[in-house]
């Protein structure tokens, strides 16, 4: 799915989409700890006009993105679209007064960076920041040694407690939406369509001559032109009786919690914040017993999501189907961000590492802000799920986080935990890991990888599980074990941990050699599912080729095999198949 979005990345990162006049401009898109709108204040999920200073005097509960780090990181968009231009100098000023900073007076930090092209990971190194304090900063650059104007001033507020490292994040917010169509069904019921589904709440403005009762039905799916009242699986449907008051009134349809996705026992469901309230995914609405006319303006869906820039990227092609697929991918990232952490949808509202990996890669392609991916990753580091491969994928997520942000701080802060996530404790002499009936899968191991004691560690391969023959030692977890070792070596190198980097590289090489020795069948030219079976599958062959484990002379045979099988896997595994 994410590969459909690759064409948008260049525009997203400011590398293409230049205006007609190739000119320089002051830096824009200023971020503090990867948050752009640090100066924005919300009330109950809606943006306000308040400044950070005014928010401290508000009688209503307010929400904002706080900065938790003693030494936050600054970044900006160079905003110079002329060819062959690079930043050659930067100056940052940080102060406690907007007025003073506008006069180029900075009482916290005034840093000059000569011969420097870093515009993404500049770490604060001024006077100690205080908790619960508003600060201001701005930046200017020289591009090809030509001085540019100062940026606008950006404000941020520190949290009540400051840390050596803690990820900043936005509150969940609301967007009000109106239906795309309103009509009557045979029999007179109102039928409303919002055009696409979202996680939200419903507000209706209705008229009544006298006290009356109507039935409001909301859901995700239609059957024979009507709302499906008994949908399959975890497709949602709700029915509410609403007592009307005489006159014209606005009613909020209260969404009640579902015990299937609001449990507070491990594995924990991610709760909705009190200022937002409970939500339900729905697209369609039916109202029974309401005889008055109703305008689209009287029907409001309050969609809940993580802050998202709908105009950060643009994609179009001559293929209308491809355009629709791209828009589906883009919108899905926004729509499924309702919990403030990547979750599995409304089924359990639980994060899973594999889901987070796919969400992460897709999200990177459709917006400029990456804190939702990082926050989800760090949550999962401490709330692991049961599949062997998905625990190993924590290291992949950490690597992509560093690759796309250039910010190594999250990996540094979680380095010890990431080391455990490689599952090196389960390695045998050949460098391969095995989970089934392994006495090393004990309470100490579960604690080390943050897996609940009541959870069984088990190989998954795919979900739903496809055509794969499970053995005690399977290729799928071992390929991801190799990938985690290789990427831990790269992360260690980025941190300057040379000895660790070399050790992980050596460990990865041993595992790679064993994968090719024990799983590859020279007779068929394909990789087996596990040691002890001759069965081969899409999974056992696509995972090795994705992570460059296949020697060049065997790649054509495996490629032909994968093409012959088509999309013989789930949406999750399709990510790797497309890779």
Residue spans for each PLM region:
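Active-site core of glycosidic bond-cleaving carbohydrate-active enzymes
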Residues: 351-358, 362-579
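N-terminal short leaders/motifs
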Residues: 223-244, 341-346, 491-496, 519-530
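Extracellular/oxidizing-compartment recognition motifs
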Residues: 25-134, 138-339, 355, 371-372, ...
């Amino acid at each position: 799915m994410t590969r459909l979005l690759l064409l948008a990345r260049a525009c997203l990162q400011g590398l293409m989409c230049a205006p007609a006049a190739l000119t320089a401009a002051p830096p824009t898109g200023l971020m503090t700890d990867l948050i752009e709108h640090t100066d924005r204040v919300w009330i109950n999920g809606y943006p306000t006009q308040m400044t950070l200073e005014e928010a401290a005097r508000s009688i209503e509960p307010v929400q904002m993105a706080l900065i938790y780090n003693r030494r936050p990181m600054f970044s900006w968009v160079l905003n110079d679209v002329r060819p062959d231009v690079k930043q050659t100098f930067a100056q940052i000023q940080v102060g406690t007064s907007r007025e003073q900073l506008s006069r180029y007076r900075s009482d916290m930090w005034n840093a000059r960076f000569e011969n420097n092209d870093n515009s993404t990971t500049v770490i604060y190194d001024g006077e100690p920041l205080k908790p619960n304090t508003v600060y201001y900063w701005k930046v200017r650059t020289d591009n090809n040694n030509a001085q540019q104007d100062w940026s606008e001033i950006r404000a941020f507020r520190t949290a009540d407690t400051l840390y050596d490292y803690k990820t900043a994040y936005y509150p969940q917010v609301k967007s009000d939406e109106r239906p795309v169509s309103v009509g009557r069904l045979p029999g007179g019921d109102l039928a409303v369509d919002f055009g696409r589904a979202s996680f939200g709440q419903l507000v209706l403005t209705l008229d009544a001559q006298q006290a009356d009762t109507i039935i409001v039905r909301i859901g995700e799916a239609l059957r024979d032109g009507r709302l499906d009242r008994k949908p399959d699986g975890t497709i949602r449907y709700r029915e509410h009786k609403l007592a009307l008051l005489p006159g014209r009134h606005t009613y909020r349809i209260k969404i009640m919690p579902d015990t299937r996705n609001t449990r507070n026992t491990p594995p924990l469901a991610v709760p909705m914040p009190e200022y937002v309230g409970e939500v339900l995914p729905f697209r369609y609405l039916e109202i029974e017993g309401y005889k008055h006319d109703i305008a689209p303006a009287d029907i409001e869906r309050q969609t809940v999501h993580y802050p998202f820039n709908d105009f950060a990227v643009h994609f179009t092609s001559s293929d209308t189907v491809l355009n629709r697929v791209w828009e589906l991918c883009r919108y899905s990232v926004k729509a499924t961000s309702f919990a403030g952490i990547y979750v599995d949808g409304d089924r359990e509202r639980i994060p899973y590492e594999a889901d987070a990996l796919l969400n992460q890669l897709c999200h990177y392609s459709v917006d400029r802000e990456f804190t939702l991916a990082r926050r989800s990753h760090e949550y999962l580091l401490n709330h692991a799920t049961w599949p062997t491969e998905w625990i190993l994928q924590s290291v992949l997520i950490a690597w992509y986080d560093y690759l796309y942000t250039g910010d190594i701080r999250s990996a540094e802060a979680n380095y010890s935990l990431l080391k455990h996530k490689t599952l090196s404790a389960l390695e045998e002499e050949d460098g391969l890991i095995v989970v089934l009936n392994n006495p090393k899968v004990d309470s100490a191991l579960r604690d080390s990888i943050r897996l609940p004691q009541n959870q069984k560690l088990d190989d998954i391969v795919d979900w739903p599980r496809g055509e794969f023959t499970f053995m005690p030692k399977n290729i799928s977890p071992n390929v991801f074990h190799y990938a985690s070792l290789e990427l831990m070596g790269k992360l260690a190198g980025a941190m300057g941990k040379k000895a660790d980097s070399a050790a992980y590289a050596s460990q990865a090489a041993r595992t790679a050699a064993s994968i090719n020795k024990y799983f590859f069948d020279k007779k068929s030219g394909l990789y087996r599912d596990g040691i002890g079976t001759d069965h081969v599958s899409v999974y056992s062959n696509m995972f090795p080729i994705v992570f460059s484990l296949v020697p060049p002379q065997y790649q054509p045979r495996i490629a032909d095999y994968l093409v012959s099988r088509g999309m013989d896997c789930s949406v999750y595994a399709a990510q790797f198949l497309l890779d």
